[in-house]
């Protein structure tokens, strides 16, 4: 099985990191979640509905849609908060990346543990910019909102390609494909990891600073 890989880059002010990451991760998981499966007998099941809600950002001029699941939201908040803290405490140039990996389990014979086979990985590269004053912050609030909107459109376009997804499992195999631990939604199995880098992400950071400078010059 070939694992698809998608890379997104965002350039944000420090206080925008959490909202930007949540917007991207929630958008991806909105398209990679189903309602809960209700099995009647082996091979026959119904799928519950997935509720959605609009989320308005505080530090970005942007509204995104997420799955209406408090459990999923808490899990993503926890992962993003850990990344944000690591980024802040790293002493680096404010460069890092978060990976959202979807995988399925392949049962192994005892005494070996199950094999986790990734089928799609999203990498979000984050560049944190420093701004001089409130005027620049207000411009950044709008510009990041515009750029984030473009990223969301990119995500939706990828989702609409109808490429490989794990086939719908039987009842005995559902835990090999979906995370069934949540009571109100059933995302494909996923894991989130992050890393902080020391190299300066000059291309995206410089682009954002140029956008702000050009706007100030108008």
UniProtKB/Swiss-Prot annotation:
Protein's UniProt keywords contain Lipoprotein: no
Subcellular compartments: Cytoplasm; Preautophagosomal structure
Pfam families: ATG101
Molecular functions per Gene Ontology: protein kinase binding
One GO cellular component term: phagophore assembly site
GO BP annotation list: autophagosome assembly
Keyword Cytoplasm attributed: yes
Primary location: cytoplasm
UniProt-listed InterPro entries: ATG101
Record keywords: Autophagy, Cytoplasm
Similarity comment: Belongs to the ATG101 family.
PANTHER family on file: AUTOPHAGY-RELATED PROTEIN 101
Protein name per Swiss-Prot or TrEMBL: Autophagy-related protein 101
Protein's gene: atg101
